[in-house]
C-alpha cells in the first residue's frame, strides 16, 4: 500500500490509484450526465416537464444527505482510516443503483415511470454521494504538501479526461451494438459494463492509497458551529461559488450535447467524432495545470485563467458547425476542452487547501463537511442547468424522436455554445478574487504543525 513519507511525498502508485478513482466516477456520473436525460425522454418515454421537476427536486434531497454523509465521513473510525472504507462499501451498491436507473420500462403508465424514475435517481445520487464525498476528501488526507496535492489532482484530472474521452467515444457505438433491436437493452447493458468499471476502479483506489495526515481528535461539533466556521473561510466560499457555476455550466451543456448533435447537426454519430477530437487536448490541458500554477503560484488565479479562455473559445463555437465547417468546429472543440481540462484540475486542487485555511482561521477542521458542501454546490449547479434546459425544451415544443421546430433547435445550439461560454467568463471573474497563494498557504501549514506539536 502507498503511504506519505516524512517529507509529505506520496508514492506514484498512490497518485495513480487516486486517479483511477475518478476514472470510476466518470464511468458512472458522466454517463448519467451525458445520457440520462435523453434516455428518460427518448427511450423511457418520460415527459420533459417531469425530468425538469426531478432535477430540481433531487437537489432538496442532496441538501439533506450531502452534509450528513460529509459529517459521517469525518466521524468514521476504522483501521483503514476515515474515508477509504466508504469506497469499499458504497461503490458496489452504487453500481447496482446505476443499472437500476437505466432499466427502462416504456410500456408502463406515465405515473409509474415517474415514480420509478424519482426513486432510482434519488437512490443513485445518494450512492454516488457516499462514494464521491469521501473520495474527494481523501486527497487532503493523503498529504499536506501543496505541490504533492497539485500532482495528485493532476493525476486525477488526467485520468478523468482519458476516461471521459474513452466513454464519449465508445458509448454511442456500444448503445448501437447492444441496442440494435431495442434501445432500452443497449442502455441497460452499457450501464452494467460501466457499473463494473466503477466498482473495480474504486477498489483499486482503496487498496493503494493511505490517509497519512494526522487529524487531532475533537469533541462533537454541532452543524451550526461548522456552518459558522465555513462562512468565515473566504477561499472556500469562492471555491464553492466556482463549483456552483461549474456544475451549472458543465452539466447543463453535457445534458444538451447529444440533443445538439442529434437534432441541430442532424447526426448523432458526430458526437463520436467530436469526442475523438477532444480527448488528446483534454489530457494535455490537465497536464498543463502544474506549469501554469508554478508560474502564478495561486490555484484560484490559475483556475480563473483557464475558465476565461474556456469561455472565449466556447463562444466562438457558435459561429461554426460540424456539418458545414468541420475543421474549424472540431479545432475549437479541442481548444475549448484543453482549457476546460486545465480548469477542472485547478478547481479540485483548491479544495484541500481551503481546509487548512479554515482550520487556521477558526481552529476547526472538518474535511468531509466542507467537501460535502462543495459536492452540493456542484450538484445544485447541475440541477439548475439540466432543469433549465429541460424546462425550456419542454416549453417550446420538444417532441422526442421527431424533427424539432426552429426555437427548440436554437435553444439547443445556444445551450451548447453561448450560454455556457458566458458563464465560464463569469466563473473566471469570481475565481480571480481567490487570494490564498502558495507562499501564504505554506506559512499557514507551518503554523498549524507548530500549534499541534505544542
What are these regions (language model features)?
Residues 2-454:
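Membrane-embedded alpha-helical bundles of multi-pass transporters/translocases
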